[in-house]
């Protein structure tokens, strides 16, 4: 079932006449793991911002369950439908990892962090004292326990070693296939792309289905 879609999306910056994204159309289904790839400057970050309701298209519609999100509240779309895993992690820096995770699900436990490889002694430490890779684990754990049906992730394995990155990819796939979430990952990682159900490529502002994953 389609949960998120792009319909004839065009996007340009206010001070430019050139479209960064040109007539994008895509449908994303619940229970699937998507990878979005492309060279630097291809528009991947803008693409993700539009899906998240952080920005609005110049022309076209972004729809959740068939409804144009512009007809409602962008903030409600982000709060109720989306959980973000961005490169700046979006963590509350004065809280601990466990407190951050419980912001989206009060029933979350330390086990949600332990299974992502965060050491137990770090769970009650201020997140500012964690490394980039450790903060990345917290952000992913928060997304996984969220009740939001869609996870949007920007390079979620970027600060992780190869072994941990592989585990994270498996967990994201599980979130899609077993929990029914729609997981969309912007990535440069061949590992993530290969593991995905579907690979979409952004090139010169155009979106095309590059290939299926596993």
Where are the language model's segments positioned?
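Helix-to-loop junction immediately C-terminal to a conserved catalytic motif
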Residues: 52
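Conserved ABC transporter NBD signature motif
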Residues: 60-68
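ABC ATPase NBD coupling module
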Residues: 69-83
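Conserved ABC nucleotide-binding domain
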Residues: 112, 116-128
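Conserved ABC ATPase signature
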Residues: 126-130, 134-136
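Hydrophobic anchor residue at the start of the ABC signature
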Residues: 140
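Catalytic Walker B motif of ABC-type/P-loop ATPase nucleotide-binding domains
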Residues: 151-154
